[in-house]
Regions:
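Non-catalytic, charge-rich alpha-helical accessory subdomains
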Residues: 158-236, 324
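Short, contiguous acidic and Ser/Thr-rich linear segments
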Residues: 331-346
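Short amphipathic, charge-patterned alpha-helical segments
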Residues: 344-358
Length: 391
């Protein structure tokens, strides 16, 4: 799974990225600080299943803190997007190429109104423009892919009576669009696909937009709510758009994670407070108190909440553990692995995720919590622990 950070220049994308990954990236107060995409590991926060059995997990990837398990996901921070990117303006072509493989967008929006659409300093900027500009550029990107040899492809499809979904999915294969995705959008939007070669430009755009929204869902990370106009703009903008929107203070999250790493405070990502455990100078104490006030107002910094919302609410993935009766691998590690599986995944899908041979030889699975056997068609649930039995 890959999550992509999008947004116009100087909106705080790189700060969000660094706060989520603690990767060493350039953070600067000017447009296009990010040229090449940054790639790092962020983490979704789940309950540590081992805690239900009086144990603590030993993750092979990720980490555990106080009953919370952090499971890794890929996070990309790409070059800032400006109006006209779909036509190559700014770093548009590079930006869009970098986004092809992501599964969902996290749109970082500067709620302060202190920088404009190009990332330059200003005052009282209309924040809603950022959302509509990014929306439109992503829609035009999909439309551009759709229109490549569209008439020729559709006439060929009509003559050969091939499936519309198969033809479109092939056109979008680089963007991870499936035939099932296309069929869903066609049915949901009630589109007539008997003669798509004569679709109007309006219908083409409508289809491209609907396909983009369905195949790459998006959340708004309403960043910089700590700034003077941030909270006011957040409340106003949230009422204008249907996208899920979470108030964020990426700068504060980064400071907390760095202070936690340095042993100055104890902070668990996603919590709404922290504990001071080290000695502070006056400047540090004041800075942390300022961060705490923002966290009280917004119930945290929002960064971890955004990551969890994308994976578990937008993409509807579930976390599942390979779990034998002793919950340990051959080296004594407790529940070392945890996998994020797509919605509606079955016990058999999970077996194949572990290894092809395990899937081929699947007999049944034993649910760690209930101790009951389940068959290959059992739809796995969030925080399931399953032991796969083979022949």
């Amino acid at each position: 799974m890959i999550l992509g950070l999008v947004g116009r220049p100087n909106c705080g994308k790189s700060t969000f990225f660094k706060s989520a990954t603690l990767s060493d990236v350039l953070i600067a107060d000017y447009p296009f600080a990010t040229i090449k995409p940054n790639h790092g590991m962020a983490y979704v926060k789940i309950h540590d299943l081992a805690a239900d059995f009086g144990k603590i997990s030993n993750p092979r990837a990720g980490y555990v803190r106080e009953g919370n398990r952090f499971v890794p996901v890929d996070l990309f921070d790409v070059a800032g997007l400006v109006e006209g990117a779909s036509e190559g303006k700014g770093l548009g072509n590079q930006f869009l190429d970098d986004l092809a493989g992501v599964d969902a967008f996290i749109h970082v929006v500067d709620m302060s109104g202190e920088t404009n659409a190009e990332g330059k300093q200003t005052t009282d900027y209309d924040v809603s423009r950022d959302i509509t500009i990014i929306e439109n550029e992503l829609d035009l990107w999909y439309l551009g892919v759709l229109k490549r040899a569209w008439t020729t492809l559709m006439k060929g499809m009509e003559m050969q009576k091939t499936q519309f979904a198969k033809t479109v999915a092939k056109q979008f294969s680089g963007l991870k669009v499936t035939e099932e995705d296309v069929n869903h959008v066609v049915l949901y939007e009630k589109l007539d696909i008997t003669r798509p070669s004569v679709w109007s430009d309006k219908t083409l755009f409508h289809f491209a937009r609907a396909l983009r929204i369905y195949t790459k869902p998006m959340i708004i990370a309403a960043n910089k709510v700590d700034r003077p106009n941030g909270a006011t703009n957040f409340k106003k903008i949230k009422a204008q758009f249907s996208y899920p929107m979470i108030a964020c203070f990426a700068d504060g999250e980064l400071s907390l994670r760095q202070a936690d790493k340095a042993g100055i405070i104890k902070y668990i990502p996603g919590e709404n407070d922290f504990v001071i455990i080290g000695k502070l100078n006056e400047a540090q104490a004041n800075a942390l108190e300022t961060i705490r006030k923002v966290m009280v107002e917004f119930s945290g910094t929002g960064v971890q909440e955004v990551l969890n919302h994308v994976v578990f609410d937008l993409l509807k993935y579930v976390a599942v553990f390979p779990a034998g009766s002793k919950m340990e691998d051959s080296k004594g590690n407790v529940l070392p692995d945890c996998f994020l599986m797509p919605p509606k995944s079955t016990a058999l899908d999970f077996a194949y995720k572990l290894h092809t041979d395990i899937g081929d030889k699947f007999v049944k699975a034993i649910n760690l919590k209930t101790k009951q056997a389940v068959g290959k068609d059992y739809v796995i649930k969030h925080l399931d622990g399953l032991e796969i039995m083979t022949r």
